């Protein structure tokens, strides 16, 4: 493969890598990996394998480990390299760095030193899961991993009960059954949800339904692979509530039906299409 080989300016380059299918990496990501003076990786073996698959030569360049337990000295060394004029590419084990992956402290340190921080965007399990979920994507909140301890997990779920966004979680395959049971217990069994497993991989699986049915389906099931759990936003089941109707009536005094529906849906965190249908009904009453 022909790479665009040209000197990179000194800086920190965050490069997104595939979450499963190796061919999902971007051409720009490969160009940066082929050109950077130094490559830092959460898992050096995974990084080397990815480069080998795509024929990216190292040509004597180093691939150094950098992960959550690397410590301040590792951050200082990489910052020193960049200040010395080097381009440093950073890759996490899979997906986009910093999104439930290492890199935050390194990025903050580079910014604090006035160094350039550049993103080479690409694969993300969060966005891939949202894309196939069938849940609203106009507003979402990425929660990441919930606490492993049951009571702490339930407390955090309770704090998210009224958030009017689609919620996105990562979870261990060993805990997903218990997590879904906790979600059902705290949020109720009627909330729509999706469990995505092994996205972009050979055994990709997307399970859709309400929390009640999904909790039953995964109870006691032996699950393998990477898991993303999505939960529909609060309020979606109550779109006909009197508060929505009154908000629409107030908005429609000064706005067109379509504009009023858009404003009210955004303010209340509800699907615009459903609010628009209610607005049309109110318009017919007049």
What positions do the PLM features span?
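A contiguous loop/helix-start segment that scaffolds small-molecule binding in enzyme catalytic cores
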Residues: 9, 87, 166, 173-286
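Conserved helicase motor
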Residues: 65-72, 146-149
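Glycine-rich, flexible N-terminal cofactor/catalytic loop recognition
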Residues: 1-66
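Class I SAM-dependent methyltransferase SAM-binding "motif I" and its flanking Rossmann-like core
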Residues: 105-163
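Short Gly/Thr/Asp-enriched flexible loops that form oxyanion-binding sites at enzyme active sites
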Residues: 98-113, 180, 184
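General beta-strand structural signal in soluble alpha/beta enzymes
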Residues: 41, 92, 117-122, 169, ...
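Generic beta-sheet signal
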Residues: 11-15, 85-92, 140, 165-169, ...
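Short active-site oxyanion
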Residues: 33-39, 114-118, 166-167
């Amino acid at each position: 493969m022909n790479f665009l080989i040209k000197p990179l300016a000194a800086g920190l380059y965050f490069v997104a890598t595939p979450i499963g299918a190796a061919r999902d990496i971007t051409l720009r990501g490969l160009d940066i990996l082929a050109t950077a003076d130094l490559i830092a990786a959460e898992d050096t073996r995974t990084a080397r394998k990815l480069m080998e698959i795509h024929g990216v030569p190292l040509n004597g360049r180093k691939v150094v480990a950098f992960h959550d337990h690397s410590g301040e000295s590792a951050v200082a060394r990489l910052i020193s390299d960049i200040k010395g004029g080097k381009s440093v590419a950073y890759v996490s084990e899979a997906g986009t760095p910093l999104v439930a992956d290492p890199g935050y402290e390194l990025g903050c340190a580079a910014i604090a030193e006035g160094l350039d921080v550049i993103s080479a965007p690409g694969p993300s399990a969060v966005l891939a899961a949202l894309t196939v979920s069938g849940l609203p994507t106009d507003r979402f909140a990425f929660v990441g991993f919930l606490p492993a301890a049951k009571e702490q997990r339930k407390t955090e779920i309770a704090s998210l009960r009224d958030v009017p966004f689609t919620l996105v979680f990562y979870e261990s395959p060993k805990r997903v059954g218990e997590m879904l049971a906790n979600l059902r217990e705290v949020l109720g069994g009627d909330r729509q949800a999706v469990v995505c497993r092994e996205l972009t991989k050979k055994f990709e699986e997307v399970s859709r339904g309400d929390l009640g049915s999904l909790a039953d389906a995964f109870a006691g099931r032996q699950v393998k692979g990477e898991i993303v759990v999505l939960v529909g936003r609060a309020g979606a089941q109550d779109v006909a509530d009197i508060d929505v109707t009154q908000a629409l009536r107030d908005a429609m005094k000064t706005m067109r039906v379509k504009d009023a529906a858009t404003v009210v849906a955004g303010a209340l965190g509800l699907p615009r299409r459903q609010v628009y249908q209610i607005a049309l009904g109110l318009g017919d009453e007049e």
